[in-house]
Design a protein with these regions (language model features):
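Accessory carbohydrate-binding/adhesion or oligomerization-edge regions at the termini
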Residues: 1-58, 133, 137-142, 163, ...
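Accessory beta-strand-rich segments of carbohydrate-active enzymes
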Residues: 10-11, 25-31, 57, 62-176, ...
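Conserved, mostly hydrophobic/aromatic
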Residues: 24, 101, 167, 246, ...
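Beta-strand-rich binding/interaction modules
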Residues: 99, 190-222, 228, 248
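Surface beta-strand/loop "capping" patches
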Residues: 171-201, 280, 557-564
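Substrate-binding/catalytic cleft of secreted carbohydrate-active enzymes
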Residues: 326-554
Length: 564
């Protein structure tokens, strides 16, 4: 399946793209140097799985590595003046890309996508050599690493280095789409269409048609790159109960050349409003309790990369089946297809920023802080077209938060980039490396194990429980080997886990509405390595809870926190 359904150049009739996932030549190297060209490498790696994973075939970390692949580019990709674009979903941490010995791209940041026009580097015929040189530091560096560690322990897990998302080629016109965003109007009857372009795009025009169930419901034309208002007839709103998505067909025209893509988006708003005198989160103008699970995006065989698209979808679907309406995507950014499934299945998403290493707050240089700010901007810009994402979380428990004002600064930075969503300036205001309240952002957020936390809103912010629960139950024969178990909140058996979950969530149902709590996040949807506090085992083979009981209490809690 096409790796980026939010900007799909291929149609069912014209699948004009070429996957480069599969076996690549591979070599770990001693340091960062220009690779040798035209020479085979001794080992192999299965892309797009990080080198530490079983599926990669390597199962060993290296700070430096080189990937090599020979590719026959179809003649149709360069016919009629087309250009060839090479796309990478993500490479951890820094990547330099060469085609036939010519450097075509350099990218810093392990959680964001990048691409390169490689047309001028292609040979007239025969195989094309693609080489990717990667620097993947994990420990001892102040960059976004999330929970990756070279020595996993407790709440920190195996590293995920190298190419860990899809790689593909596609033919494009000289002027082409790089990104399309559809931002719902506050009036909920239109989208603002924003296009980002690549190549020579002077005097290019954009035409977009919106479809609902295959029928056109709006269209707009104008200058490419400028924001355009696309009015929608008889608006159909997106919500977890009804995750309706509009389909869009967009054409970028410049002279005789056309770039045609399909996209999609849901029509919804998210914000804070006074409800009964208290600040509450409102979805489409209505108070909504955001009942979520913590989702860390780890798999035993692929680490950061799901083994299949079905596996990627599984956690989202099961979260929905259990009666939750929200996911907190914890300290990780997922491939575009993950958000596609969240959009379609209907779950709201709190999107964390992958953290800098914890415990290093006093050691961060000005360059470290600037690098984090730059990465935050890149992640927001990449993901702000995703319907499911309703809010951003720049800091978790103070990890990498170098000062109290830093949370306010990042919250303001994100709000300027994306005023259409909520910003939770720091999750876990009462915990760990957090030093104090910056009095910024849209929410007050506390962590309380086992909890739940019941913080009250204040004069400017709504409130939520950002993490609670963590009831721990290991299941024999489904436990990650050779990792110390993090045993907080242990229960003796499945019955105790079920009873504990129901009792815990009932507190939110019974006390949350009166206090004005707008949401909660239960830790967590699956076990992860040494953490056995999932509702599913790490291998996803055992559901530890009674789905019917969990769904019933969850639905009651969402109703209690909704419109009166």
């Amino acid at each position: 399946d096409y790796p980026r359904p939010q900007l799909a150049r291929p149609s069912l009739d014209h699948p004009t793209w070429m996957s480069l996932n599969g076996l690549w030549q591979y070599a770990a190297t001693e340091g960062q140097a220009t690779p040798t060209f035209g020479k085979s490498l001794n080992d192999q790696v299965l892309v797009p799985y990080p080198i530490e994973s079983v599926l990669s075939g390597v199962q060993k970390h290296s700070d430096f590595m080189v990937y090599r692949r020979l590719v026959d580019v179809p003649a149709s990709f360069t016919a009629q003046g087309k250009h060839v674009r090479l796309n990478f979903g993500a490479v951890a941490q820094d990547a330099t890309v060469y085609v036939n010995g010519k450097e075509v791209a350099k990218h810093i940041g392990g959680y964001t996508s990048f691409s390169a026009d490689i047309t001028q580097a292609l040979r007239p015929k025969g195989s094309q050599e693609i080489i990717v040189a990667v620097h993947a530091p994990v420990d001892g560096v102040n960059v976004m690493v999330g929970k990756q560690r070279l020595k996993p322990d407790g709440i920190f897990y195996t590293a995920a280095s190298g190419i860990w998302q899809s790689v593909w080629l596609e033919p494009v016109p000289a002027a082409s789409f790089a990104q399309l965003e559809f931002t719902p109007a506050s009036s909920l009857d239109a989208f603002t269409v924003t296009s980002k372009l690549q190549g020579s795009s002077g005097n290019a025009t954009l035409h977009v048609t919106a479809y609902a169930d295959g029928k056109p419901v709006g269209e707009v034309s104008g200058a490419a790159g400028a924001p355009l208002r696309l009015a929608i007839k008889q608006p159909h709103l997106w919500s977890p109960q009804d995750p309706f998505l509009y389909t869009f067909k967009a054409t970028l025209a410049q002279g005789e050349q056309r770039d045609e893509v399909t996209s999609y988006a849901g029509l919804r708003t998210i914000g804070i409003a006074k409800v009964g005198g208290l600040n509450r989160v409102v979805l489409n103008g209505k108070p909504t309790f955001l009942l979520g699970t913590l989702d860390q995006g780890y798999w035993p065989d692929g680490i950061y990369t799901a083994p299949t698209d079905e596996a990627l979808k599984f956690d989202i679907q099961k979260t929905k089946d259990l009666g939750f309406n929200t996911i907190r995507k914890h300290i990780k950014v997922e491939p575009a297809r993950w958000y596609y499934w969240a959009d379609r299945i209907g779950l709201m998403v709190w999107q964390d920023m992958p953290s800098l290493p914890n415990g290093h707050n006093e050691k961060l240089s000005d360059a470290d802080k600037a690098g984090f700010r730059k990465d935050v901007t890149a992640i927001v810009e990449q993901l702000k077209g995703e319907t499911a994402i309703i809010g951003w979380i720049p800091f978790n428990e103070g990890w990498g938060q170098w000062s109290i004002p830093a949370a306010a600064e990042l919250a303001d930075q994100i709000k300027k980039l994306d005023p259409s969503r909520l910003v939770n300036a720091r999750s876990g205001a009462n915990c760990c490396d957090t030093k104090g309240d910056p009095k910024a952002g849209d929410l007050i957020d506390v962590h309380d194990y086992q909890g739940p936390g019941l913080p009250a809103p204040d004069a400017t912010r709504a409130s939520m429980d950002g993490e609670h629960g963590g009831l721990t139950l290991g299941v024999a024969d489904h436990i990650w080997p050779n990792t110390a178990i993090n045993p907080y909140g242990s229960v003796k058996d499945n019955a105790a886990l079920n009873d504990g979950y129901v009792a815990n969530t009932a507190v939110l149902r019974d006390k949350g509405p009166g206090i004005g709590v707008s949401g909660s996040v239960y830790t967590q949807i699956t076990d992860v390595e040494g953490e056995h506090n999932g509702l599913y085992t790490y291998d996803r083979k055992v559901e530890k809870v009674d789905e019917g009981r969990v769904r019933a209490i969850n639905e009651e809690t969402i109703r209690a926190g909704g419109p009166r």
